[in-house]
From Swiss-Prot:
Sequence intervals crossing the membrane: none
Record-given protein name: Engulfment and cell motility protein 2
Coiled coil: none
PROSITE patterns membership: ELMO
PANTHER family hit by this protein: ENGULFMENT AND CELL MOTILITY, ENGULFMENT AND CELL MOTILITY PROTEIN 2
Gene giving rise to this polypeptide: ELMO2
Stretches assigned to the PH domain: 553-674
Organism: Bos taurus (Bovine)
InterPro entries linked to this entry: ARM-like (IPR011989), ARM-type_fold (IPR016024), ELMO_ARM (IPR024574), ELMO_dom (IPR006816), ELMO_domain-containing (IPR050868), PH-like_dom_sf (IPR011993), PH_domain (IPR001849)
Amino acid sequence: MPPPSDIVKVAIEWPGANAQLLEIDQKRPLASIIKEVCDGWSLPNPEYYTLRYADGPQLYITEQTRSDIKNGTILQLAISPSRAARQLMERTQSSSMETRLDAMKELAKLSADVTFATEFINMDGIVVLTRLVESGTKLLSHYSEMLAFTLTAFLELMDHGIVSWDMVSITFIKQIAGYVSQPMVDVSILQRSLAILESMVLNSQSLYQKIAEEITVGQLISHLQVSNQEIQTYAIALINALFLKAPEDKRQDMANAFAQKHLRSIILNHVIRGNRPIKTEMAHQLYVLQVLTFNLLEERMMTKMDPNDQAQRDIIFELRRIAFDADSDPSNAPGSGTEKRKAMYTKDYKMLGFTNHINPAMDFTQTPPGMLALDNMLYLAKVHQDTYIRIVLENSSREDKHECPFGRSAIELTKMLCEILQVGELPNEGRNDYHPMFFTHDRAFEELFGICIQLLNKTWKEMRATAEDFNKVMQVVREQITRALPSKPNSLDQFKSKLRSLSYSEILRLRQSERMSQDDFQSPPIVELREKIQPEILELIKQQRLNRLCEGSSFRKIGNRRRQERFWYCRLALNHKVLHYGDLDDNPQGEVTFESLQEKIPVADIKAIVTGKDCPHMKEKSALKQNKEVLELAFSILYDPDETLNFIAPNKYEYCIWIDGLSALLGKDMSSELTKSDRDTLLSMEMKLRLLDLENIQIPEAPPPVPKEPSSYDFVYHYG
């Protein structure tokens, strides 16, 4: 008799018949099991049938996937994938429109299954679908529902990666692009057309060229002015794909075209400031657009200044002229010789705060920030001239060594902003932290620089800094900026107000508050008390982590970014013995019941938890593997027999919660950054509560000394 681990108990359904309760021996061939089921209902030709799941996406069961069947699973006896594909192929070409519509509905559903998709594609199903679309002008006006299902099936089939996107014809591309450009088209058709075009652009460089010729900026921007956020999301996703795949020499042209069509202001008014909350996928696409826009600065950021280029040197002359000679040209002054002018220029460049007073062009030879720093300085000097002149003259007139060097500050600040905003980095698959204020101005980076250079000047004065304190000031300014950004101000003015509240004295107060637990609680008695309390705190954190796992979390399925989001959910049983998980149709807003999660893993079967590049799905997905931030959110459960459950957490917080909780289940230490932070916070609070009675009492560093022995013990009385 086979061991219990090879036996799974399932229920198998068939329309119009009572369900069969069956014990499946996983060592038996699947064909033998199907024959037994067919015999139970007296069905001939068992080779025409197969098993599939009754719930969820109703995936077919194959020899490769049968190990996923768990005890208590409900299965269906169904027509085999090859037979179903053949029948649907015939029905999709039926003369009856009702038959074709029903066939397309079923095809759109079954195409998500890779087993069925392989069979259908092997019958040239993709070619049949593309021909239906290519000849579909009449179809669009009368049978838009059928066209929507056709496009859905096509996208599902192509998404499996079985065939290359390069097989798509130019006629098909023109037809899909036509649906996007038509003013009145069914929402479902438009949504799928945008998704198909995005997939083409992302998966084929040759198709990018063709689509870029067919789709205009104006056509895509018009879809951002609708009230349907899903259409807006797909439109921005296609814009991002075109932006991402465009050759470097054409990206700036695309950005200019977007500016001419007022893309930024349309997104601001119709998406960000719309009356609907921003969904996760929209937030991600806005984040991607923000990153790609800032990445346009990378070329200037990595370009060194050529000291021999007169045009570039003229920019530095212009900075000097605006600051000191706005109304006059010293070269025309009577008796002004070359040597005298050079001496005056050197003095002026020193007052401007350049490190190299004789040849300030040398200050811009370091990359980053390269020429981008000079661009920022010129923008400030021309667009915010009063601010520029005030900053320069205010510091150049000081005689007490407390002047803030504008040139050096501007260069270092530009470099800092590039680091904070990760200019030049590719978008992260798992992030959605866009900043609304960057969509409020066409020159957002330059405006941000203008705000921050004023902040730097203000902080310099508050610190009464000298040249030796330059790096300290830059550290404080970085802290001010990074503390202000997470609040996501809606405008640059709000950001400026937030920075104003984060003065140097406030930063000191925050630092002192954050260091209090480290600075104030280092005496031996306090350390001993901390060590006594710490196990209680860690147990409290452990219970919180396990409770969060019992509540569960939703995770996005890998590889579905360019289509409608798909989610799966995982939660721990209340007795902490089983992990339940399963697919979802939508991202849940509340708790998902155990009954709706079809799969489960006994905690006792879990062998290990692996993270990052050790995860199987990170080794398989080369594109994901290259993304450092996705790697930092990836983890996998390894369980018997040689199976894995792969996760990509939505954010760092959820990642830490799950890593801690799973580690606690396995009896291992919780070592995440979140645990350390929670432990320190809770320890600090508990210590303060326990030490309230000792307020204003100095706790000695050492125990009190033992007194000397008395000269005699005559005071001791012995009872007889």
